[in-house]
Amino acid sequence: MTMITFLTTTQNGSYDRLATRQAVFLKQNLNVDSQIIRMAQTQLVPVKGSHVIIYTTFNIYPVLINKYRQQLEGKKCVALLDSALMTIPYRNPVFKDPICTVYTTSRFNQENFATLGVSIPYIPHFIPDPNPEGKLKSLSERQYDFITVGINEMDFDRKGHFWNFLVQRWGFKAISVCKFYCFGDHKQDLPDEELWSLYANTKWYLGTSHAETPHLPLLEAYAFGTPAVYISAHEFRYIGFGIPISPAYINVKGTKNFYFAEINTESFIQAVGKAMRMSEGDYNSLSKQARRFFENNYSLNNRVDEFRALFDDSM
């Protein structure tokens, strides 16, 4: 029987949470067993799978390959990489090393690689559908106006929860799911089922991340027909679906040197106002489009053959 090993470099972050969901899906639908190694950059764990998927950043990938190279020899290995940092080692030959086939799940990253003379193929994330029945609530059935989800870096509010706090102060019913930087009404460490319930019961995903590559919470919100009010910068420029906010400026910020986009306050006010003035009929139509956007681009349920093709259908 085929076994997949997921090498991830997070602990309760987007990489290992996605791997966990994929592992459940693969077992239920393909009878494929999985091994998930979290924080793999900090430890050397025996790789049991004949097939390997690596979830990490372009920055950490060279370190991970160095550590696990011997264990990856002879295995079918695919790396699905992204990074919101400006310190990506774009020209590092390890990204072309045959030990593992490298893809990026970020069109923002792909564009920057191409600009600097390196071709990296793009493939969207394979996300098990958290709403497989496709049930969508209408505008009037949704309890919250806005939701923002994200665990932040320690040195600044990278996920932009402050903007969620602002709409709370303005009188809207909004909620944040956060970790280190939390403002106003918020929740922490939610199980998936509660998080998905929040998506289903919220009108708009407030996508105000200052630095981002494929944002799992935003994409999962689309599965529940929840469109976005989002900053049109970094990866959100490609995956945002709904009402865009203009950036005020783009810079580098944080101890890790993040690509940083600040929000234009006037554009933010206009976008929030447009969202809250939208009619029931127009919203419900947009909600259905958001759901289709997820189904057509990200749903693993609809892309099993494409997933298997990563390994030349040997899985």
Swiss-Prot record:
Transferase found in the keyword field: yes
Tell me which domain of life the UniProt entry assigns to the organism this sequence originates from.
Viruses
The keyword ATP-binding is assigned to this record: no
Family annotation (InterPro entries): YkvP/CgeB_Glyco_trans-like
> What Pfam families does this protein map onto?
Glyco_trans_1_2
Q: Which UniProt keywords apply?
A: Glycosyltransferase, Transferase
Broad EC category: transferase
Known EC number: 2.4.-.-
> GO MF annotations for this entry?
glycosyltransferase activity
> Which family does the UniProt entry place this protein in?
Belongs to the glycosyltransferase group 1 family. Glycosyltransferase 4 subfamily.
Q: Would you tell me the protein name for this molecule?
A: Putative glycosyltransferase ORF315
